[in-house]
Amino acid sequence: MAKTILCHCEDIEIDELYSALEQGYGDLETLKRYTGIGTGKCQGKCCIVQTLRLLASLQTSHTRESMMGDPDLIHLPTIRPPVLPMRIDDIADMEEDTP
Amino acid sequence: MTKTADIVVIGGGVNGLSCAYNLAKRGVKNIVVLEKGYIGVGSTGRCGAGVRQQWGLEENIILARESVKIFENLSGELGFNTFFRQGGYLILITDEHEHEIVAGTLPLQNRLGVPTRLLDTKEIAELVPGLNLDGVIAAAFCPTDGFCYPYAVLWGYAEAARRRGVTIEVNTEVINVEARADGTYTVSTGTTAYQTPVVVNMAGAKTKDIAAYLGITIPTQPFRHEIAVTEPLKPFLDPMVISLKKGFYFSQSIRGEIVGGIGDEHEPSSYQTGSSPEFLLRYAKAIRDTFPALGKARIIRQWAGLYDVSPDARPILGGVDGKPGYFHACGFSGHGFMLSPVVARLMSELITTGCTSIPIDGLNLARFDGGPVTKDPYVVG
Ligand SMILES: Cc1cc2nc3c(=O)[nH]c(=O)nc-3n(C[C@H](O)[C@H](O)[C@H](O)COP(=O)(O)OP(=O)(O)OC[C@H]3O[C@@H](n4cnc5c(N)ncnc54)[C@H](O)[C@@H]3O)c2cc1C
């Protein structure tokens, strides 16, 4: 069967998302940490919106109710710096007092 | 809506969930855990999940040692891989004063069964090739220290607690707790009032706010601590490397990322958990100084969480005189993950039997009423 990759950085297939949902890991914050989606080099720029789209289209019966909560809980996770991966050397060489 | 419970646990962090699990294991039936967000949204989900037994005070060493024993079998017990890896903690020593403190406590640690030993620079270089040893005079190394993946521990406890009948309500914030005339409590969320004889307050840095509903004053303060992670690298680093003096720590996760942080003595007390570029700069300098080759590694993400700091940097555990059925565990001061297995065991003993197999009287809230308290010299950041 063809595989559908959801998160390219971490090589996560769509089936892994479904399996996590079936085990009750239903909200995005938890899915991110359970499957690894969005935690790779691009930090979710490619996969998080796809994951959200899938979550929004799925029947809530897929998930344990207590984890799913209400649809308002489907939101983007906090975007953490740095925006792009940065070398420790490059950071350490930055000037302390740049505004 | 009104519901009843035998025990209401407030907080779905590692302490609340492990306590609920231990209570269920001891036969308590109707346990409800109330968590305002998702599991792990508090400090636990943001922490380094390091587990060490190298402490200066006897009580701290014993608690940490007992926790490690539980961590060693926790994956099997919970039926969930916690990714506990015992690569040891390597405490770098950079001056004579620090040497005196660390070397001075080794006999105590060893007597209590914690196998810490002092390494000279040659042994350090063998253990962690690539460390910059300029200015390092020795290191303390305990091979049975280690770390976990914090979410795995949380989910493991949550699953095991649910299997034993515990109800875990997420996205459910406690907005009031009231003592009733009959000696029980009402714990209110927006939609439900739980009537219960026992309230277990383990709301992390918010524990003191919950306690305040009952007129209990807890002298803890929240402080932001920042942390960062690199892209995954080939496994090369076994121990967690830390400096008590410089306040940094870093280790390599099972996924290969370097996870670490550094404290900031100027950080004011607040509930803010935003990320700062100043931290990144300080951390990058400290890491490059300590392990120059890591300069080539790229940081992909930084975040922050709260330390709930008590006046002596030691946890506050137990009940409160005049409030039967009320219990709390807080003030972990940055060490609440490593202590959670033993804290859960002892708190569940206290709640169900009134006594504990390891004395924790010295950690009760009332200790702050009296004279000065003793701080452990092994506090980082
Ligand atoms: C950057 C960082 C690194 C750390 N590294 C380590 C380490 O290496 N080793 C170690 O041992 N410790 C470490 N710590 C400390 C550790 O994270 C904490 O001590 C520990 O996780 C505390 O667990 P807890 O369950 O008591 O609290 P929390 O995990 O904070 O859980 C409390 C829960 O209560 C919930 N809550 C709060 N108010 C309410 C309310 N009104 N109603 C319902 N729920 C509520 C919160 O949402 C939260 O989920 C670190 C902390 C940080 C920030």
Regions found by a protein language model. Name each.
Chain B
Residues 82-93, 105, 112, 118, ...:
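Helix-loop-beta segment of a Rossmann-like dinucleotide-binding subdomain
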Residues 142-197:
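Helical element adjacent to the flavin cofactor pocket in flavoenzyme catalytic cores
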Residues 288-381:
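C-terminal catalytic lobe of FAD-dependent flavoproteins
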